[in-house]
């Protein structure tokens, strides 16, 4: 969710090492023990301190590493201090501009972290919601991986003893397209693996047993 009234934000943090272009100020509704959750906001500033945009989250969950306790006032935190990320920066659609993903709860596969994804619109000069990337970051096991070299996004999922790996390519004008799928079935002592690769718009399937 984008701009809205900030009637919460009892605990304030700032992250300066997450992006080359932006600093982020995080406000969380509730912080106890080693983590924060509840309604929250992420405010982006450029490196000169100019406010750029605000994002709201219904459940901005993040956890600190052991022996780190939040306190009152604005606290500077680094990614090395966190064991669960409230936000990610990266070029998620490979258009040369930095995008952002904001934690929206634990709506992923098996209760894993889920994120709202916003991509930078060079025409509007602001971040706009991406429905398909949000679905990719909310329906699997945590935030998707970004491979800048192959220009692919990777996600993982699990269903009982079966493990899934998916790779997507970002196609201009078409959005994200599934190009690779790996299924590992550990139901029995023998592991059955099925790999599907899209080659020249056709699926090539390989099955193995170990």
Regions found by a protein language model. Give the residues of each.
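Acidic/hydrophobic-patterned starts of short beta strands in beta-sheet-rich repeat architectures
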Residues: 24, 91-104, 148-155
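Acidic, small-residue rich beta-repeat scaffolds with periodic aromatic anchors
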Residues: 3, 7-51, 147-210
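Short, surface-exposed coil-to-beta transition loops
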Residues: 37-39, 85, 101, 111-115, ...
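Beta-propeller blade repeat segments, especially FG-GAP/WD-type strand-to-loop junctions
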Residues: 45-48, 111-132, 167-173
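Beta-propeller blade termini
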Residues: 13-15, 27-28, 82-92, 139-151
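Beta-propeller fold detector
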Residues: 53-58, 128-134, 177-185
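Acidic, glycine/proline-rich Ca2+-coordinating loop motifs
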Residues: 59-61, 103-106, 110-116, 126-127, ...
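Repeat-based blade/solenoid architectures
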Residues: 62-86, 134-145, 189
């Amino acid at each position: 969710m984008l701009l809205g009234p900030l009637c919460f934000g009892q605990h304030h943090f700032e992250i300066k090492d997450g992006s080359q272009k932006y600093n982020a100020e995080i406000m969380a509704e509730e912080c106890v023990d080693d983590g924060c959750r509840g309604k929250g906001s992420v405010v982006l500033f450029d490196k000169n301190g100019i406010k750029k945009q605000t994002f709201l989250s219904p459940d901005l969950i993040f956890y600190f590493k052991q022996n780190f306790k939040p306190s009152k006032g604005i606290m500077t935190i680094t990614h090395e201090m966190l064991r669960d990320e409230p936000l990610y920066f990266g070029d998620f659609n490979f258009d040369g501009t930095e995008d952002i993903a904001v934690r929206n709860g634990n709506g992923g596969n098996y209760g894993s972290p889920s994120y709202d994804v916003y991509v930078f619109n060079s025409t509007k000069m602001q971040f706009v919601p991406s429905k398909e990337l949000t679905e990719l970051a909310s329906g699997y096991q945590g935030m998707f991986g970004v491979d800048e070299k192959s220009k692919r996004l990777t996600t993982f999922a699990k269903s009982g003893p079966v493990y899934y790996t998916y790779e997507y390519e970002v196609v201009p004008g078409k959005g994200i397209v599934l190009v690779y799928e790996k299924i590992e079935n550990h139901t029995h002592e023998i592991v059955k693996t099925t790999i599907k690769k899209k080659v020249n718009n056709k699926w090539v399937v390989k099955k193995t047993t170990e």
